[in-house]
Amino acid sequence: MNFETVIGLEVHVELKTNSKIFSSAPAHFGAEPNTNTTVVDLGMPGVLPVLNKRAVEFGMKAAMAINCEIAEHTKFDRKNYFYPDNPKAYQISQFDKPIGEHGWIEIEVGGKKKKIGITRLHLEEDAGKNTHTSHGYSLVDINRQGTPLIEIVSEPDIRSAEEAYAYLEKLKSIIQYTGVSDVKMEEGSMRCDANISIRPIGQEEFGVKTELKNLNSFNNVRKGIEYEEKRQAEVLKSGGIIEQETRRFEEATGKTSLMRIKEGSDDYRYFPEPDLVDLFIDDAWKERIRAEIPELPDKRQIRYINDLGLPAYDAMVLTLTKEMSDFFEATLVAGADAKQASNWLMGEVSAYLNAEQKELHETGLTPENLAGMIKLIEAGTISSKIAKKVFRELAQNGGDAEQVVKDKGLVQISDEGALRTIISEILDNNEQSIVDFKNGKDRAVGFLVGQVMKATKGQANPPMVNKLLLEEMNKR
């Protein structure tokens, strides 16, 4: 029997506000444990929450960016559960009236585009953080408690691990462009749970789902889904049944293990938050927030293709992160050719960032010095090979491209007389290569070009070397 996989993703994103959603405590990552707290976060008796307007507006902006309808009337609810990192014994969330509903984003997998529906986007507060030690006790940090979150719930439209990965990449890119979050999974500002079920191909009814947690990277989301697909298929083929449960992805083994039997909404005993009034959002407020949304990656990608003549793949890669896209645009403003700037950013720059595990702003590169280097290549001052040395110097230490070339003595040798002298000397020492060339062995030319480049430490003008080398060999 063959099965179809059905996946829905729940993505939590921390909003980049200065203070928490219901208290005045700072909402910054990395502080000493239990220092970013107030009596509201600690759940002290008699304290009252105060709604952070900026968190609401960030939620509206994110919802609009993923094509959600914004509610005219929304409210907050209490989700009741007891856990050490939740001092109040309830979480303030949104149950039946979320701030955004009925959205969608478009993904592309294997050259095919597909719309993934968004069921809802709602606001809520984050919980604290438990650290379980090997000594039989746990440490609780309340700093994260009350940090504003949006939860984005997809429709069960995803059919493979690859589609789930593409959905997360696209969602991260869109949220990043809006500026409401830095969406860094390594810092916990973007987290994902996956709901997975399988059903016989052709069956309309959904199978019993399991929820996967501890998915701390996009790759782990993919691996967890792939494992769970196989596990559920093996259970059904052996005559077993799938239990509705929550499972943990174990990164070390690549497998999932039981955490607990999955709760339903009734288990949380939702009821309207009595300490917060309902929220009404009028058209004027919506339009003001909509006007703040910048050009999003899909539109920017189309502009790069139509206006700059970039290939679709280049446009997609350049717009994947806002930092890379903004850097590219600033490089064009600084005078660089669009295709050359694209090639450098997608090639050497991306390779350097991956190898060094850095982001653009953590290097010495600027749009101005990258554009300056590209202009030096176009002017023939340096070759593409020399440019790689210049690039590394700029990436590591910053500075001006032209000054680096002067200081390092990297100006390309384009003097015909100097090159002819070097070529003549190399031909005198490699007479067999001349014979091979005249016998039709083209590899001999490549060897001799390499000898010239070696003699000039890579600074000879390559097209001129080829031209002069052929001229000198034909004279002999």
Curated annotation (Swiss-Prot):
The protein's enzyme class: ligase
Transmembrane region(s): none
UniProt entry tagged with the keyword DNA damage: no
E.C. number(s) listed in UniProt: 6.3.5.-
Signal peptide: none
Keyword set, alphabetical order: ATP-binding, Ligase, Nucleotide-binding, Protein biosynthesis
Official protein name in the record: Aspartyl/glutamyl-tRNA(Asn/Gln) amidotransferase subunit B
Annotated SUPFAM superfamilies: GatB/YqeY motif (SSF89095), Glutamine synthetase/guanido kinase (SSF55931)
UniProt keyword annotation of Ligase present: yes
InterPro entries in UniProt: Asn/Gln-tRNA_amidoTrfase_suB/E, Asn/Gln-tRNA_Trfase_suB/E_cat, Asn/Gln_amidotransferase, Asn/Gln_tRNA_amidoTrase-B-like, GatB, GatB_C_1, GatB_Yqey_C_2, Gln-tRNA_amidoTrfase_suB_CS
Origin superkingdom: Bacteria
Gene of this entry: gatB
Catalyzed chemical reaction(s): L-glutamyl-tRNA(Gln) + L-glutamine + ATP + H2O = L-glutaminyl-tRNA(Gln) + L-glutamate + ADP + phosphate + H(+); L-aspartyl-tRNA(Asn) + L-glutamine + ATP + H2O = L-asparaginyl-tRNA(Asn) + L-glutamate + ADP + phosphate + 2 H(+)
The protein's assembly and partners: Heterotrimer of A, B and C subunits.
Pfam family, one: GatB_N
Function statement: Allows the formation of correctly charged Asn-tRNA(Asn) or Gln-tRNA(Gln) through the transamidation of misacylated Asp-tRNA(Asn) or Glu-tRNA(Gln) in organisms which lack either or both of asparaginyl-tRNA or glutaminyl-tRNA synthetases. The reaction takes place in the presence of glutamine and ATP through an activated phospho-Asp-tRNA(Asn) or phospho-Glu-tRNA(Gln).
Biological-process GO terms, alphabetical: glutaminyl-tRNAGln biosynthesis via transamidation; translation
Organism encoding this protein: Listeria monocytogenes serovar 1/2a (strain ATCC BAA-679 / EGD-e)
Protein family according to the UniProt entry: Belongs to the GatB/GatE family. GatB subfamily.
Annotated PROSITE patterns: GATB
Alphabetized GO MF terms: asparaginyl-tRNA synthase (glutamine-hydrolyzing) activity; ATP binding; glutaminyl-tRNA synthase (glutamine-hydrolyzing) activity
